[in-house]
């Protein structure tokens, strides 16, 4: 299963709010410049009111949760999975399967800030994570041009069927807190759109069930 | 499904290390006294070297991850689940199903510190979470005296069978980062001990699959 977390709400603090007190004090506290820290709704909420599309931005916790669910899964540990993070503003984060994502959120944030600063992590030796410019369309093309989407309005499948369908697919999940894909074509050109249950699930919940279904299908659980 | 996260690695900083620089500076930075903040391996590692059983302490992120997986699940949202946190040092944290756990880890830590300070959260109105003294044995007795355990050395069951077995059970999962239950009787007196896959899983991974299996069994996914 290749998981693509799309339009993920992770980015460095945009220039237009560098001088906002909520941002400046957070950066100073952490000994960094405002442009070097991740935008975080939990810390920078007062500064985000005027940001375009602000409700869908500043949620690195979504990426953290999904990476924890995926990287520590049996699917990934058995070499049957790979995850790519496509971000708002068109960056692609590649994560090698053996990458142990920090379980502590603050350590994860520091790792992501290093990644944005250097384009790779760790700074030396074999890179485990890499960041480069890239569009969602380009990534999906690179991954073979065929994908399925997990979406609240998708078709319901029995759990076992869903697992079989996802195990060998490129699976796109939205990495944003609210609303829908800005890239409408992701849904329109998908080979299939599946829902997981009858209610909207956040990204980590959807990925948890997709991975469990694929693992059950592969006989891992 | 009633989930009991047992011997969870969450506690306030113990008195013996209040004066350690790593603790004192963290408390000062957060405007709190050392005895009011959660012990956190990611922040207080230098202070924990001499702590008894230190390798199994100071991991509130484990409780956070499990609560996120459980509280935002379809199982819980449909009223088919309930979670209790039993902590190291014998506290019991009760969490009402409608409790929306903060997705941001730092906000979660603040909520837990309020809970330890006041015994409840939020401070006024209907409480959503409550903390009180209590043993694991007392809790399991209160919940009917019959339980199953998820454990790496448990019996493997097909995913569908596991779901059916867990859906209407009290399910105990270890809330500690390493090692095994200190309460050996938890395993010895359990009605059944199940494993999820052939490799050890961290608590959140085990709970993610247990919940997905129970949901599939209940026809929710």
UniProtKB/Swiss-Prot annotation, chains A, B:
CDD domains: Nep1-like. The record marks 59, 100, 103, 107 as: Interaction with substrate rRNA. GO terms for biological process: rRNA base methylation. Pfam families: EMG1. InterPro entries: Alpha/beta_knot_MTases, Rbsml_bgen_MeTrfase_EMG1/NEP1, Ribosome_NEP1_arc, tRNA_m1G_MTases_N. Its EC number is 2.1.1.-. S-adenosyl-L-methionine binds at residues 174, 179, 196-201. It comes from the Archaea. This is Ribosomal RNA small subunit methyltransferase Nep1. It comes from Pyrobaculum neutrophilum (strain DSM 2338 / JCM 9278 / NBRC 100436 / V24Sta) (Thermoproteus neutrophilus). The gene is nep1.
């Amino acid at each position: 299963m290749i998981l693509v977390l799309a339009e993920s709400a992770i980015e460095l603090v945009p220039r237009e709010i560098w001088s906002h007190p909520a941002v400046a004090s957070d950066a100073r506290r952490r000994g960094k410049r405002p442009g070097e820290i991740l935008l975080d709704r939990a810390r920078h909420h007062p500064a985000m009111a005027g940001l375009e599309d602000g409700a869908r931005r500043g949620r690195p916790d979504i990426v953290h949760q999904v990476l924890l669910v995926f990287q520590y899964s049996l699917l990934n540990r058995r070499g049957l999975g790979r995850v790519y993070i496509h971000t708002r503003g068109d960056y692609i984060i590649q994560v090698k399967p053996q990458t142990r994502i920090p379980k502590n959120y603050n350590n994860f944030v520091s790792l992501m800030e290093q990644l944005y600063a250097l384009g790779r992590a760790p700074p030396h030796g074999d890179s485990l994570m890499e960041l480069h410019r890239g569009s969602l369309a380009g990534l999906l093309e690179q991954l073979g041009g065929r994908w399925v989407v997990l979406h609240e309005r998708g078709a319901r499948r029995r759990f076992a069927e869903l697992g079989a369908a996802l195990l060998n697919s490129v699976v796109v999940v939205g990495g944003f807190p609210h609303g829908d894909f800005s890239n409408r074509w992701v849904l329109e050109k998908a080979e299939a759109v599946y829902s997981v249950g009858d209610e909207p699930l956040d990204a980590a919940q959807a990925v948890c069930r997709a991975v469990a279904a694929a693992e059950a299908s592969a006989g891992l659980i």
